[in-house]
A protein has these predicted regions:
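Short coil-to-beta transition motif at edge beta-strands of beta-rich domains
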Residues: 2-14
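Residue-identity detector for threonine
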Residues: 10, 28-30, 65
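Short connector loops at helix/strand junctions that flank enzyme active sites
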Residues: 14-16, 32
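Short beta-strand-centered aromatic/proline hotspots
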Residues: 17-26
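Basic/aromatic-rich interaction segments and small domains that mediate binding to polyanionic partners
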Residues: 25-50
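Intrinsically disordered, low-complexity, charged/polar segments
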Residues: 44-69
Length: 69
């Protein structure tokens, strides 16, 4: 099952950083779905393939976990 992160929601990375998902997009050449997100602390922007977003961390836990407020 594919887990699609929700835009405008905050996720915690397994290393501790907090990130806001901005939107999902599609790579123009490969059609791969990308997760576009922003660091809450630094304001930096990132894009990561959805497959990578959903991969477990090296320790086996979720790479990103939805933070419920």
């Amino acid at each position: 099952m594919i887990n699609y992160p929700e835009p405008n929601r905050t996720y915690k990375h397994y290393k501790g950083g907090l990130y806001k998902v901005l939107f999902l997009s599609k790579h123009t050449e490969t059609s791969e779905i990308l997760v576009n997100y922003q660091s809450i602390l630094f304001g930096s922007y990132y894009s990561r393939p959805l497959e990578s977003w959903n991969e477990p961390s090296p320790g086996g836990e979720n790479r990103f976990t939805l933070i419920e407020y």
